[in-house]
A protein has these predicted regions:
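The alpha/beta-hydrolase serine catalytic core
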Residues: 112-230
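Glycine-rich nucleophile elbow surrounding the catalytic serine of serine-hydrolase chemistry
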Residues: 97-113
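N-terminal cap/lid segment of alpha/beta-hydrolase-fold proteins
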Residues: 1-27, 206-215
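Alpha/beta-hydrolase active-site loop
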Residues: 45, 73-97
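Hydrophobic anchor at the start of a short beta-strand
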Residues: 58-60, 96-97, 115-117
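Short His-Asn-centered micro-motif
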Residues: 63, 100-104, 120-122
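Short, surface-exposed "cap/lid" segments of acyl-processing enzymes
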Residues: 12-15, 20-64
Length: 230
């Protein structure tokens, strides 16, 4: 079994972390996970897929974004644009050859346009906001409070708001509301259930394992990265 590597990259004055497998392989895929609470639900499957890839001789790196996990940066200070810069910086510093993104990760993967890109189930930013707002409204209702989507969005114009356990600032909310995955020249897009068989674990209440899903992701990434160079 391939041992994990704990890697660092530096952005905006902070040392941020990545989880890596496969060492200095000829192919090195930067994996951008889903954003916010979806990130936590998919992490186990992505790590399993990375181990599988390493067993195939393919290197991979799972980025930890500023404001997430062990980062010392504050999530409320982040925006989609700052995360785009982060992905760009990480890809350069760690010398990756390919970029793979899942769900909302496809909203921040577009700065390294010369690299081959792979996306699984890309989503618009507005869809992510709506899902998180529904969660917040449901939680408020259980607590005996009443708040609307319009009220939350108005609050978000001037101050950070908590959505699904994430404290998001005005810049993040504003950019998410209009964000769509950008078209790229060297792009492969995969649909869940058609191109890759698996369950939408990002919708589950808790993180779950799915070894078959992880293996399917790894097999597709292996074929794709081999076919498009690197």
């Amino acid at each position: 079994m391939s041992a994990p590597e704990y890697l660092r990259y530096t952005v905006a004055g902070y040392d941020e972390f990545c989880l890596g497998f496969g060492g200095e392989s000829a192919r090195r895929i930067l994996i951008i996970p889903p954003l916010f609470d979806e990130m936590n639900r998919m992490r186990r499957v992505l790590v399993s897929a990375m181990r599988n890839l390493a067993g195939r001789g393919v290197g991979c790196v799972l980025i930890d974004l500023p404001g997430c996990n062990e980062s010392l940066a504050l999530l409320k200070d982040q925006s989609l644009d700052s995360w785009r810069d982060t992905v760009d910086t990480c890809a350069t510093q760690l010398a990756v050859t390919h970029i793979a993104s899942i769900r909302g990760g496809a909203l921040i993967d577009d700065r390294q346009r010369d690299l081959p890109h792979w996306r699984l189930a890309p989503v618009k930013g507005a869809s992510l906001i709506k899902t998180m707002i529904r969660t917040r409204i449901a939680g408020e209702k259980e607590a005996g409070n009443s708040i609307s989507e319009a009220q939350l969005m108005q609050q978000a114009e001037t101050a950070p708001i908590e959505l699904a356990g994430n404290l998001l600032g005005p810049d993040m909310i504003t950019q998410l509301a209009v964000a769509e995955p950008l078209a790229l020249a060297n792009l492969t897009e995969r649909k869940l259930g058609e191109d890759i068989i698996g369950s939408p674990l990002w919708l589950r209440a808790e993180p779950q394992d799915d070894d078959a899903f992880a293996a399917n992701i790894a097999a597709d990434l292996d074929r794709w990265s081999a076919s498009c160079g690197g």
